Amino acid sequence: MLQRQVEPELMNATDQVEAYAAADFSQSDQALVEWIAQRFPMGLGDRVIDLGCGPGNIALLLVQRWQQIEVVGVDGAPKMLAVAKARGQALGSDQARRLSWQQSCLPDPTLPVGFTAAVSNSLLHHLHEPGVLWESIKQVAAPGCVVVIHDLRRPNSEEELQQLVERHAATAPPVLKRDYEASLRAAFSAKEVQQQLLQAQLPQLKVMEREDRYLTVWGQLA
C-alpha cells in the first residue's frame, strides 16, 4: 500500500476554482445521488448538510432530486462558495430558496445542527486529521441522521496510481490532472476508514469499496 501524502485542505486558488467549475462531473455526481436514492428509499428527511460542498455540484442535485429538502452547503474556500452561490441562484426560485451556503473549516463549533442527512463528496482525503469529519457529523446530526460520505480510495501501488490517472484524467486540464494524482495519494484505504469509524464510535456506518477508485461510507445514526 502506498504511504499517504497529505495535500492542502482548501482549494481556493483561482486556477483550481476555474478548472473545477468548468469540469463536467455530472455523470459521476448524478450517479452518486441516484445511489443515495436507492440506498435510502424513504428519502433524506427535510434538512441536509453538504460538508465540503465545493462549487455546489451535489447540493444542487439534491434539491432537484428531492423537492421537500433544504440543503446547507459548507466549504472553507470562499471562491468555491462564490461559484456554488451563483449556480444556486441560476436555478428556479423554488430550488434556489432551499439552498444556503456557509463558509467554514472543520472543526467548527458554530455549525448549524439538527440535520436529517449529512453528505460529503471528496472532502475526507483533504483533511489532515480525518477524525474532524466524523466528529462534525455527530455534532450536526439529528437522531436517525442519514450519512453518506463518498471519496477516493488510495491505490495499492505507484503503478496502480498511474494507471488510474491515465484512465480517468488523461485528457483533463493540467491543473485537474495534477490535483487528481495528489488526491489519490492523499486518500484513505477502506481499512483505514473503518478504523476511523471505530475510533469515532460510529460502528453503525458501513464502508463500501466502489468501482476502481472510490469508497463510500453510509448508514444511519441512532
Language-model features: locations:
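Conserved glycine-rich SAM-binding loop
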Residues: G54
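Class I SAM-dependent methyltransferase SAM/SAH-binding core
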Residues: I49, N57-D108
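C-terminal alpha-helical "lid/dimerization" subdomain adjacent to the S-adenosyl-L-methionine
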Residues: L152-L202, K206-M208
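A conserved beta-strand element that flanks and buttresses the S-adenosyl-L-methionine
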Residues: V119
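Conserved beta-strand signature within the Rossmann-like core of class I S-adenosyl-L-methionine
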Residues: C145-D151
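Conserved alpha-helix/loop element of class I SAM-dependent methyltransferases that forms part
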Residues: S26-D46
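A short glycine-rich, Lys/Arg-flanked "PGG" loop and its adjoining helix->strand segment in the class I
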Residues: W134-P143
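N-terminal, positively charged/glycine-rich alpha-helical extensions of SAM-dependent methyltransferases
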Residues: M1-E18
